[in-house]
Structure formats: structure tokens, C-alpha cells
């Protein structure tokens, strides 16, 4: 089981340099955890690619369809008071943006407080 960041999900939806790595990781372990806003983050990335004309309208429609199918298959970590508490604590200890703290908190929550038990797939630089 791995927790997937949108930066690793988007390459499963459209061809990117990191697509082969994302696909290999998914084949190795098809159980996907994602936070409740992952779909919105992925949609934002797809919309940006379409606006920048890196993705045709037809390719974008297909990518959104793949996202819907993938979303239905992943395990989603919902926002809770506990998640908010962990995210707030992370912000006091680490230099993070709010959204990054929320996502990291979701991964920690999914790992039931034992982060080493769940892999984190992220291609952000």
C-alpha cells in the first residue's frame, strides 16, 4: 500500500517523463491511498496542461475519464479533526505550505501514526 501524491497520479493519466515509473510502481502495488483533495489537484494539473496546449481537448477528456475510474478505485483519506490537528502540528515543525501539510497529515493518518509502514509516491521537486 502506497500513498500517492497528485504529481505521481497525473503521469498515469497523461504521457509524461515520469509515466513509466508511475506505472511500474502501480503494478508493484495496486493498492492506492490518496487524500480527499487528490482528484481536485489532478483536475487542476490536467486543466493547466490543456490551457497550455500541452494536451488536446480530446486527450484531456480521456484523461478526465481515466481520473474518474482511478478515483473510484483508490482508497481516499477523508478530512477529519485528527487530520487537521496533525497538519497544524506539521506546520509548526516543518516549512510546509498548508496544502502540503494537509496531504502529509493524510498520509500519516492513513499509516495509523506509523509512517514507515506506508510508502509515499511523490514526484514533486
Model-derived features: positions:
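Short glycine/serine- and small hydrophobic-enriched flexible loop segments
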Residues: 11, 44-51, 108-112
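Active-site-proximal, substrate-binding regions of enzyme catalytic domains
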Residues: 37-92
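Short glycine-enriched loop/turn motifs at secondary-structure junctions
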Residues: 25-27, 69-71, 113-115
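Active-site neighborhoods of divalent-metal-dependent phosphate/nucleic-acid chemistry enzymes
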Residues: 73-125
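Short, well-structured N-terminal submotif of metal-dependent ribonuclease cores
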Residues: 1-39, 49-62
Amino acid at each position: 500500500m502506497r500513498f500517492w501524491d497528485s504529481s505521481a497520479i497525473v503521469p498515469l493519466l497523461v504521457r509524461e517523463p515520469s509515466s513509466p515509473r508511475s506505472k511500474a510502481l502501480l503494478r508493484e502495488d495496486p493498492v492506492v491511498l490518496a487524500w480527499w483533495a487528490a482528484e481536485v489537484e489532478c483536475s487542476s494539473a490536467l486543466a493547466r496542461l490543456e490551457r497550455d496546449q500541452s494536451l488536446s481537448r480530446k486527450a484531456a477528456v480521456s484523461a478526465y475519464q481515466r481520473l474518474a475510474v482511478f478515483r473510484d478505485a483508490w482508497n481516499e483519506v477523508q478530512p477529519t479533526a485528527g487530520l487537521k490537528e496533525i497538519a497544524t502540528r506539521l506546520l509548526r515543525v516543518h516549512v510546509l505550505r498548508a496544502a502540503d501539510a494537509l496531504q502529509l497529515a493524510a498520509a500519516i493518518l492513513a499509516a495509523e501514526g506509523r509512517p514507515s509502514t506506508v510508502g509515499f509516491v511523490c514526484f514533486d521537486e
